[in-house]
Amino acid sequence: MNCKNMDTSYEIINYLTKDELDIDLSCMDKKERYKIWKRLPKCELHCHLDVCFSVDFFLNVIRKYNIQPNMSDEEIIDYYLFSKPGKSLDEFVEKALRLTDIYIDYTVVEDLAKHAVFNKYKEGVVLMEFRYSPSFMSFKHNLDKDLIHEAIVKGLNEAVALLEYKIQVGLLCTGDGGLSHERMKEAAEFCIKHKKDFVGYDHAGHEVDLKPFKDIFDNIREEGISLSVHAGEDVSIPNLNSLYTAINLLHVKRIGHGIRVSESQELIDLVKEKDILLEVCPISNVLLNNVKSMDTHPIRMLYDAGVKVSVNSDDPGMFLTNITDNYEELYTHLNFTLADFMKMNLWAVQKSFVDPDIKNKIISKYF
């Protein structure tokens, strides 16, 4: 696959306005509701660009580069992707590492970035923050991290221009150093080196208490880079220390996932006091077995308690889902309304790390 051969046509989306939020969804079938979810002007803050692709894109790369010549399409999907509930985040990480097979050259990386922007526009996203991990994308085929970054920025910018700026895109750098101070520092230095292209910094991978790395996060923040780390996602961890560290020591503006805030009234009060938004990824939480079912997802309780939350797809390529699937699940299982969703998306725009002028224009146009 090559960018020059990619379908860059697009349709104009007739977005919902504030005056159209009383649409009766109850009389619609699923197909009709999906048309509404698409028309809802959305801001997505938590999506890993590394795994933001359609099945067709993924299989095209696998076949073009002859990566798994002895597997059928079904076997490839089962081997690499995570379309049904698993046992844990660890199981997901194991599969995600296999995915690095596809980051075989810089053309694939650029194509992936461009493809992701077009897909998000087609889902009705007006403001999109992608994040990616330089180390994750580079290690399997020993690609140069700076050239990976160059390819991603080029792909994103070209796609936004081809879409005539009907979608705005920001980029976060993700560090995933685990408990290695050296790897964490290396990721932070990469982010600072390319800070003109990044709007924020994130830590992902296995959830850990980041207290030992406070100095690294302080350095990033002092460079004017906003912070959002994964915390309060993994229910197998016996404490909530990652959340307290993120809030009280790292001074994050947002938290990736953060659903375990619901387990503590003190944490609920704390995120409200500090005006921290939780980047909630509903389908991801269920598939990774951090929430037993969508009916019991804590986003409903958090929203009702006055905590700012947003709706996100996390790893849509891995999950064979997209952002509109998450809205459908929240409507079907937790009775969220269009007005609720509009409020969440306004919060997301307000808490986005992109330039304030971009945010103000989007708020004025859609909210």
From Swiss-Prot:
Binding site residues for Zn(2+):
46, 48, 230, 314
| Alphabetized InterPro entries for the sequence | A/AMP_deam_AS (IPR006650), A_deaminase_dom (IPR001365), Ado/ade_deaminase (IPR006330), Metal_Hydrolase (IPR032466)
Which reaction(s) does the protein catalyse, per the Swiss-Prot or TrEMBL entry?
adenosine + H2O + H(+) = inosine + NH4(+); S-methyl-5'-thioadenosine + H2O + H(+) = S-methyl-5'-thioinosine + NH4(+)
The family database entries (Pfam families) matched by this protein are listed as: A_deaminase (PF00962)
Q: Which UniProt keywords apply?
A: Hydrolase, Metal-binding, Purine salvage, Zinc
GO MF terms here are: 5'-methylthioadenosine deaminase activity; adenosine deaminase activity; metal ion binding
Q: Which SUPFAM superfamilies match?
A: Metallo-dependent hydrolases
Does this UniProt record's set of keywords contain Signal? no
Cofactor(s) annotated in UniProt: Zn(2+)
Cofactor descriptive note: Binds 1 zinc ion per subunit.
Positions marked as site (Important for substrate specificity for S-methyl-5'-thioadenosine): 176
Annotated EC: 3.5.4.4, 3.5.4.31
Pathway field: Purine metabolism; purine nucleoside salvage
Give GO cellular component annotations, separated by semicolons: cytosol; external side of plasma membrane
Chain ranges passing through the membrane: none
Q: How is its activity regulated?
A: Inhibited by coformycin and methylthiocoformycin (MT-coformycin).
Q: Please name the PROSITE patterns in this protein's record.
A: A_DEAMINASE
* UniProt effect for mutating residue 174 to I: Slight increase in affinity for adenosine and severe reduction in affinity for 5'-methylthioadenosine
Q: Where does a purine D-ribonucleoside bind?
A: 48-50, 176, 205, 233, 257, 314
GO BP field: adenosine catabolic process; hypoxanthine salvage; inosine biosynthetic process; negative regulation of adenosine receptor signaling pathway; purine ribonucleoside monophosphate biosynthetic process; purine ribonucleoside salvage
- Statement: the UniProt record of this protein carries the keyword Nucleotide-binding: no
The ranges of region (Gating helix loop) come to 174-188
Which family is it part of? Belongs to the metallo-dependent hydrolases superfamily. Adenosine and AMP deaminases family.
Main function: Catalyzes the hydrolytic deamination of adenosine to produce inosine. Unlike mammalian adenosine deaminases, also catalyzes the deamination of 5'-methylthioadenosine (MTA), a by-product of polyamine biosynthesis, to produce 5'-methylthioinosine (MTI). Plays an essential role in the purine salvage pathway which allows the parasite to use host cell purines for the synthesis of nucleic acids.
Name of the protein described by the UniProt record: Adenosine deaminase
Give the organism, scientific name.
Plasmodium falciparum (isolate 3D7)
Query: Taxonomic lineage per UniProt?
Result: Eukaryota, Sar, Alveolata, Apicomplexa, Aconoidasida
